[in-house]
From Swiss-Prot:
Subcellular location: Membrane
TM region positions: 606-626
InterPro entries from the UniProt entry: WIT1/WIT2
Tissue expression remark: Ubiquitous.
Region (Disordered): 577-597
GO biological process: regulation of establishment or maintenance of cell polarity regulating cell shape
Name of the protein in its database record: WPP domain-interacting tail-anchored protein 2
UniProt feature coiled coil, ranges: 81-152, 188-218, 312-542
GO molecular function annotations of the record: myosin XI tail binding
A single GO cellular-component term on record: membrane
Role noted for this protein: Together with WIT1, required for the nuclear envelope docking of RANGAP proteins in root tips. Plays a role in nuclear shape determination. As component of the SUN-WIP-WIT2-KAKU1 complex, mediates the transfer of cytoplasmic forces to the nuclear envelope (NE), leading to nuclear shape changes.
Gene name of the record: WIT2
Organism: Arabidopsis thaliana (Mouse-ear cress)
Regions of compositional bias (Basic and acidic residues) in chain numbering: 580-597
Amino acid sequence: MEEIIREDYFEALSSRNEEEQEMLRMLTKLEIDSAYTSEKLMNLHVLLMHLLAWDNDLEGMGTLDSSPASFEKALTFDLLCGILESEVKEVDEVLDVLEAQIVDTSYKISSCKHGNYIVIEGKLGESAESLKQSRGQVSEITLQLAQLRRTLHYIRNGTSENEESVELRQKYALKPSDLRHKNALRMLEKSLSRELELEKKLMEFQQNEEQLKLKLHYTEEVSSRMEEASEFIWGRFLEADNSSEVLTGISKELVGRLQILQFSLNGSAQRESELKSKLEDCTVQLEAKDLLVQKLEGTISENSEIVSEVLTLREYVKSAEQKLKNTDLELKSVNASKQEILVHLAEMENANESVKENLFEAESRAESGEAKIKELDAANLELTEELNFLKDADDKKTKKVNSLEKQVRELEVQVQNSKVSSEANQEQQNMLYSAIWDMETLIEDLKSKASKAESRTETVEEQCIVLSTTNSELNKDVSFLRQKAKSLEAMLDLANNEKERYAQEITTRNKVLMDMMLQLSSERERIQEQLYSLAKENKILRVNQCSNTYQRNGSYAGDKELSFHADGHEIEALAESLQEDERTREEPEKQSVSEKSSEIRRAIKLKHILVVALVFVLFCSFFGVTY
């Protein structure tokens, strides 16, 4: 039964440990998933900031006057919005799954209720709070996505909002530097919030570590106290074992004494049977004497005096017979008491040497009684001889009667002595009964003490087994807690390292982003200046071209007035030559203008390509970090 109980206990412990490990695994998985979703939401928020910054530049797109670069930018904006929307949907699905997992784990923890219930419940509360925060972020991103979709709808349909709203937007529109500053501040706020969350987690880990250290200290104290209690109980168990061994030795000695008493009682029973046979012989002899006395009465009836004497003698003989009967009854009672003694002695388990001495004295007294009976038999024989002698001689009757009276008196004295001896035997039997009763009580007390000692030893053994099992369980729990503490320390080290690494990466990426934003702004300003200078040059060239054409037209008119009277063939030749000169002059101007416009287009395309590539690289880098 004890082995079965132990097996059930160890199975329950193993099942409890497995449940705790499963709960911890689920909690770690939930924490990892929540961290993944929060990181992904941060990256999506950064992408949303970039899209909002683009939204301010996409006001004039979708019109007929817009260039293909603006259409390309609108397409990239649309693609990025679609990617952001799909990612937000995916994050929303992940949050639904996480919420279901949190509900499931909370139900399992409430059904189990093991030792780490408070810690696990706190971790679940933290994960639920982070899930609520991520839900709020998702809702904000969806609202801003709806605004971006509205702008895309206006761009696709080629319509814009009311002019008043456009004027208000232009009036209250933020500058690019303000937007950059605002985005940088938002990024810094998010990074500070993440650092605060990490510091909170570090504080929680430190508190958990302190609690685990306190638990380890308490378990070590409990194990030391249990070891002291087990040592004390083991000493008590050894004392009980020694006392049980002493009691077993005493019981063995008492059993040996009982066997000796049984042998002595068997000998006394044999002697009693011999005495019974002798008493029967005495009764037979007394009957024969009664017959002789009757014959003597017939002979003594002749003489009155002799008859009176014989009557007295008869009375004396009757009294002697009664005394003998009383002695027989006493002997029978003694036999019955001895039989009862035998029955009690069969149930007894202890004896004493004083009982042996009393039995030996009783045997000696029985032998003395046998000797007295022999003397009585001899006296009876003498009486019969004297009676026969009285028949022969009447003169000597008086003397013989006197002698007979003396002998009867002696017999009465002997009978009294036998009574006294029988009373002494009864007293000895009573003493024997009392001694036997005392021995029986001692045996019962010893039995009760032995049973109590056995029960105590059994309880001590059970307590030792329970203590050993609890000690082994405590050792296992201590080893498990130590391993857990080591793993938590390793996790803390990893978390610190990851925190430092993420902080370094964040700082480096912030620097890179700021540098890239500065480069983009400088390039944008340079390109705008180039466009402005090119536009001025274009205007100057157009003005020069117009002035040249007007001057040429005026000179040709003067020549015509001067040479009005010239021949028609000469005028046509001059006109053709002038047209050829204008064509030769306009061709290099057109080529220079077309080359400048192509360079401008190439610069704009390169700018858009660089911006798209930069956004794509940033997008890939952030999603690479999340994954």
